[in-house]
């Protein structure tokens, strides 16, 4: 089945800002997260689709490629033939611009020397809890990656042999072709721009110079990190080609939905049910925070939906000593399954309210006044 447009998946316009894209993704992630829909395959597919769309559109380079070329622009299988399977889509641009400016987008070459490529960046998606995001912690991750072959030491050639100068391009990495009145320089089809070829490939890595491995890396999650942020681990991407530098690893953070709190920047929000007696008479209530319990006083006559602000009970911002606030939205709870005695007491209470006039129900009086003026 054909993939849907990434902008359509997130429900944003093609000129949407990074913040709009992030907010749209967070909304969908909260709605379709597997933790909230444990038995829904449909929700799982929606979550994966939204996650893929966000990963592409939140990366400026990938978004630009997608905007110009669609799904083909970000498909890792497109353009993979260049540079013996390394570099992918970026190498296609490298061949074009490298011929014009003397170096490739993915690397460069000294004149007469083999093409040098920087290793591809890797991305690792990591889910953490809200508590871990708030307090920070150190952890280990296992990342599937590529490493230089230990048998041929990354050369791709059988031990005892070495790569030879490409006979087609004579080590230049490019060949010139004439088409009518034009002379076009393009990547050598035999060596794929490396300037060398391998007559006897290494049996262990089949001439690629790299082997699959799983790296165990230490990752420090800083306190205050937010959903969608990335942590860069320099040099832990794929190895370079022909002496090129290794790429980087980007650990992208996704925060799981919390059972109690919703995060908005450095602020937290929670819904707090309170008995109708506490709402009417006032009193002290306890609320959970990420640092333990806190208490505050509910004034007499509190209405359902009233919001209370607890300063400094939110999350400390990234690299900041100042914490956000906790917003408690109280919901007045109506009692159910009353006994006969409780029902009689409430009827007496209701009668006493009626005798006292509208002063006991200011919201009802205001509402009825508005309705009355509407029909006049």
From Swiss-Prot:
<dbReference type="InterPro" id="IPR036410">
    <property type="entry name" value="HSP_DnaJ_Cys-rich_dom_sf"/>
</dbReference>
<feature type="binding site">
    <location>
        <position position="202"/>
    </location>
    <ligand>
        <name>Zn(2+) 1</name>
    </ligand>
</feature>
<comment type="function">
    <text>Participates actively in the response to hyperosmotic and heat shock by preventing the aggregation of stress-denatured proteins and by disaggregating proteins, also in an autonomous, DnaK-independent fashion. Unfolded proteins bind initially to DnaJ; upon interaction with the DnaJ-bound protein, DnaK hydrolyzes its bound ATP, resulting in the formation of a stable complex. GrpE releases ADP from DnaK; ATP binding to DnaK triggers the release of the substrate protein, thus completing the reaction cycle.</text>
</comment>
<dbReference type="InterPro" id="IPR001305">
    <property type="entry name" value="HSP_DnaJ_Cys-rich_dom"/>
</dbReference>
<dbReference type="InterPro" id="IPR008971">
    <property type="entry name" value="HSP40/DnaJ_pept-bd"/>
</dbReference>
<keyword id="KW-0963">Cytoplasm</keyword>
<dbReference type="GO" id="GO:0005524">
    <property type="term" value="F:ATP binding"/>
</dbReference>
<keyword id="KW-0346">Stress response</keyword>
<feature type="binding site">
    <location>
        <position position="152"/>
    </location>
    <ligand>
        <name>Zn(2+) 1</name>
    </ligand>
</feature>
<dbReference type="GO" id="GO:0051082">
    <property type="term" value="F:unfolded protein binding"/>
</dbReference>
<feature type="binding site">
    <location>
        <position position="188"/>
    </location>
    <ligand>
        <name>Zn(2+) 2</name>
    </ligand>
</feature>
<keyword id="KW-0863">Zinc-finger</keyword>
<feature type="repeat" description="CXXCXGXG motif">
    <location>
        <begin position="166"/>
        <end position="173"/>
    </location>
</feature>
<dbReference type="GO" id="GO:0009408">
    <property type="term" value="P:response to heat"/>
</dbReference>
<keyword id="KW-0862">Zinc</keyword>
<comment type="similarity">
    <text>Belongs to the DnaJ family.</text>
</comment>
<dbReference type="GO" id="GO:0006260">
    <property type="term" value="P:DNA replication"/>
</dbReference>
<dbReference type="Pfam" id="PF01556">
    <property type="entry name" value="DnaJ_C"/>
</dbReference>
<dbReference type="GO" id="GO:0005737">
    <property type="term" value="C:cytoplasm"/>
</dbReference>
<keyword id="KW-0677">Repeat</keyword>
<keyword id="KW-0479">Metal-binding</keyword>
<feature type="binding site">
    <location>
        <position position="205"/>
    </location>
    <ligand>
        <name>Zn(2+) 1</name>
    </ligand>
</feature>
<dbReference type="GO" id="GO:0051085">
    <property type="term" value="P:chaperone cofactor-dependent protein refolding"/>
</dbReference>
<dbReference type="InterPro" id="IPR018253">
    <property type="entry name" value="DnaJ_domain_CS"/>
</dbReference>
<comment type="subunit">
    <text>Homodimer.</text>
</comment>
<feature type="binding site">
    <location>
        <position position="166"/>
    </location>
    <ligand>
        <name>Zn(2+) 2</name>
    </ligand>
</feature>
<feature type="repeat" description="CXXCXGXG motif">
    <location>
        <begin position="149"/>
        <end position="156"/>
    </location>
</feature>
<keyword id="KW-0235">DNA replication</keyword>
<dbReference type="GO" id="GO:0031072">
    <property type="term" value="F:heat shock protein binding"/>
</dbReference>
<feature type="binding site">
    <location>
        <position position="169"/>
    </location>
    <ligand>
        <name>Zn(2+) 2</name>
    </ligand>
</feature>
<dbReference type="Pfam" id="PF00684">
    <property type="entry name" value="DnaJ_CXXCXGXG"/>
</dbReference>
<protein>
    <recommendedName>
        <fullName>Chaperone protein DnaJ</fullName>
    </recommendedName>
</protein>
<dbReference type="InterPro" id="IPR002939">
    <property type="entry name" value="DnaJ_C"/>
</dbReference>
<dbReference type="InterPro" id="IPR012724">
    <property type="entry name" value="DnaJ"/>
</dbReference>
<feature type="repeat" description="CXXCXGXG motif">
    <location>
        <begin position="188"/>
        <end position="195"/>
    </location>
</feature>
<feature type="binding site">
    <location>
        <position position="149"/>
    </location>
    <ligand>
        <name>Zn(2+) 1</name>
    </ligand>
</feature>
<keyword id="KW-0143">Chaperone</keyword>
<dbReference type="GO" id="GO:0042026">
    <property type="term" value="P:protein refolding"/>
</dbReference>
<feature type="domain" description="J">
    <location>
        <begin position="5"/>
        <end position="70"/>
    </location>
</feature>
<feature type="binding site">
    <location>
        <position position="191"/>
    </location>
    <ligand>
        <name>Zn(2+) 2</name>
    </ligand>
</feature>
<feature type="zinc finger region" description="CR-type">
    <location>
        <begin position="136"/>
        <end position="214"/>
    </location>
</feature>
<dbReference type="InterPro" id="IPR001623">
    <property type="entry name" value="DnaJ_domain"/>
</dbReference>
